[in-house]
Amino acid sequence: MNTFYTKNKLTPIINVSGFMTKIGASITNSESIKAANKIFNYFVNIDELQSIASKRISKYLKTEAALITASAAAGLTESVASMMTGNDLSKIYKLPNTNKMKNKVLIQRGHLTNYGAEVRQGIELSGAKILSCGQKKICTLKELQDTISKNKKNISCAMYVVSHHCSDYNAVEISKFIKLCKKNNIPTIIDAASEEYMEHFFKLDADVAIFSAHKFMGSLTAGIIGGKKKYIKNIYLQNLGIGRGMKVGKEAIFAAIFGLEKWYKRDLKKEINNQNKILKYWLKFFENENFNGISYKIIPDPTGNKINRLRIYINNKITK
């Protein structure tokens, strides 16, 4: 059979994981494909295109400004870099050398997770230093405040990671984290790469939040950063320094605009019904087959996305 996989000598993939980078993230949506195909044939002023993206995307995110970068991971590094440099070009050119800069990033220990690469490394690529707080399983508000009090003059920003990778960690709740940072005049960066409810973080008064364009939105590979205008401008300036190696093409910028707009205009009720039909099909399948050594249950998304998963448990002492 001459399928895409056999023709290109690729291993066929049946995706039961979700939007994972390792398997190509997602199936690209039609609007993003059309947008990319249109702009491929034109020269454009990238600054102007990013300005248009900012206006159109920030309207949906309900925040002041936005920009497109190469990926959410790139956005993490650039956002941290901007908190150390501000709009000072001499500092931007100097990175990753952060001598004489406020270069510490406050983060709860359980948020130093690995999503395929380490959050720690994404932060340190900018030249910043990790200031972790809390214990192995828990972090408290008092621990955060104590850490801030002892290190305040060296803290450039604070990062909060929203991900199923660290959902079991007893972290300080995000609204309390942001409120505490505001009280101490520390800007907040939210790493929410795979989270659907994007505008939620700006309702909580986050200064910057980072999302993936090519996961649940199904756009081309890119990261979307939203937030307060002064911070977004400083992040964009990183393209004159370490951000140059993380630059994003015109096609990904244009596609992200249309991908996000399509996402917000989708029929959510229909989408949830379709997901539930698939879950019910597989539940019925396992109930009817009654496999020995296999159990299963539906697991709600741990960070609040509107999806459920069917988790399969295999007893390898019984089932081979």
Regions picked out by a protein language model, each given a short descriptive name:
Residues 2-27, 54-57, 62-66, 73-264, ...:
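Conserved PLP-enzyme active-site core in the AAT-like
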Residues 44-48, 91, 156, 247, ...:
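Residue-level signal for secondary-structure boundary elements
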Residues 14-52:
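A glycine-/small-polar-enriched, mobile loop at the entrance of the PLP active site in fold-type I
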Residues 39-40, 47, 91-94, 271-278:
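Charged, low-complexity, helix-prone segments enriched in Lys/Glu/Asp/Gln
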Residues 60, 264-298:
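Conserved PLP-dependent catalytic core of the aminotransferase class-I/II
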Residues 4, 290-320:
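Conserved C-terminal alpha-helix-loop-beta "cap" of PLP-dependent enzymes
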